[in-house]
């Protein structure tokens, strides 16, 4: 649940984006802001689920990537799943997501943010491996986990920046 870009590629080469659940970003689910002259990432075995906005944001169809064995699903019947103007079929004809599906993963309880998929057949088709998403993130010793924590000053600075952008009604940052 973020404003946009549940996955956002900025810099990087041959990143691996695998076995994730991206759910309910407000504006766009996937985006890339920097086009580089190499394979930026592989996007496989992911579930992208949303109820508002669009599937793809800026540059998704132009960034160098390979995408396959994913599930895309939009609960809003008025929204058409497309890849920046390309239908799913056209996207596949370009060599992307040839083994992917538009299908409901049937999450356990969306309202309670329990994103455990119940559609086991779909999980097999896309090679998705179940995991306890509540344990995702930095793990290890207490000292190691503390390295990932933001200081109160950093949190306050971030909150201030967001507020300033919202007051200026800046939508693309």
Where would I find each of the regions flagged by the language model?
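Active-site neighborhood of glycoside hydrolase catalytic domains
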Residues: 1-7, 11-22, 38
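Alpha-helical context
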Residues: 23-24, 46
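Extracellular beta-strand/beta-solenoid scaffold signature
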Residues: 1-9, 26-34, 52-58
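Acidic, glycine- and Ser/Thr-rich low-complexity intrinsically disordered tracts
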Residues: 13-18, 36-173
């Amino acid at each position: 649940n973020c404003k946009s870009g549940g996955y956002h590629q900025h810099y990087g080469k041959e990143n691996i984006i695998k076995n994730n659940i991206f759910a309910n970003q407000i504006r766009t689910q996937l985006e890339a802001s920097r086009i580089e002259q190499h394979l930026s990432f592989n996007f496989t075995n992911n579930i992208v689920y949303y109820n508002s906005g669009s599937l793809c944001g800026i540059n998704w169809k132009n960034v160098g990537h390979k995408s396959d064995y994913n599930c895309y699903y939009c609960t809003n019947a008025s929204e058409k799943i497309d890849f920046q103007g390309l239908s799913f079929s056209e996207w596949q004809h370009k060599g992307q997501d040839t083994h992917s599906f538009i299908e409901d993963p049937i999450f356990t309880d969306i309202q309670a943010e329990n994103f455990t998929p119940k559609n086991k057949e779909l999980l097999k088709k896309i090679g998705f491996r179940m995991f306890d998403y509540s344990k995702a993130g930095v793990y290890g010793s207490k000292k190691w986990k503390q390295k990932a924590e933001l200081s109160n000053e950093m949190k306050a600075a971030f909150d201030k920046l967001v507020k300033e952008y919202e007051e200026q009604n800046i939508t693309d940052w």
